[in-house]
Structure formats: C-alpha cells, structure tokens
Amino acid sequence: MKKDVLIERIEELVRPIVSELSCELYYVEYVKENGEFYLRIYIDKEGRVSLNDCEAVSRRVSEILDVEDPIKEAYYLEVSSPGLNRGLYKEEHFKKYIGSEVLIRLTSSLNGVKSVKGLLRDVSEDSILVEGETEIQIPRDKIKAANLEGEI
C-alpha cells in the first residue's frame, strides 16, 4: 500500500476514536528511523493534551489497528500532542494559526533567504503571507517545513 493511501486509511480508522475521546486528530505520520517503523499520531484539543488523553487514544487506536491490520510490518505506535512548536502541514493548520509567529524553512532560496520568521498574515490554496522584517509571499510548494514559534 502506498504511504499516502496508508495514512488516509489510518486517519479514517482513528479519527472517530480520537473524536469520541474529546480530542482532534491533528496529524498522522508513518516513518522509518534507524531501521524501525513508527506510526505517530498527533492529537490536539482545547486546553492541553494530557498524558491520560494520549494513553486513552493509544489504547483504543491500538485495538482498532490490531483488528483492521492496515500495516503489515512491525511498528511502534506513538501518540502525543503536536507541542508548542507544532508543525503546520495542512491548509487548515495554517488557517487556524493566522496571526501567530511562525518559522518557515524553504526548499530553495526565495528573495535571498532560506528561512522566514514572522507573523502568519494570510493563507491561500497556493501560498502564505508572512510578515517579518518585510512581508513575503511564499508559494506553498517552496515550503520545506513550517512550525509555530513560541506560545499558542
């Protein structure tokens, strides 16, 4: 199964569980690190995500993944909050944090810089607007990584 199809399938399986437990599915990633596979599920909610939230989601998700078995190789399941310096992966993440301080790392130099730090001012389907020392319109396909900076 292709990785993006696998992630979609896992999101379909776990989203209802995460919602039942009063949390929001923030992001899912499946990676290989040092020869081991990791399924990482990031959850969020109003207020703070607690260790108990992560444990409850982990238990329930583990049960459904054991039954549905979408991943054929051995893997480690990790459930956590996305953290204060959370990654911004989807358009909805960018839109949620308009007005927040962000750090954007670029795939290649844009206007002589490889990273931009500033306030996220606007989001469109194909670009974001960040106000740092100057305003810069960044095409979405030039974003290597995007993270919140500081408190949310």
UniProtKB/Swiss-Prot annotation:
Its main location: cytoplasm. One of its GO terms (biological process) is translation. GO terms for cellular component: cytosol. Pfam families: DUF150_C, RimP_N. Coiled coil: none annotated. It is found in: Cytoplasm. This is Ribosome maturation factor RimP.
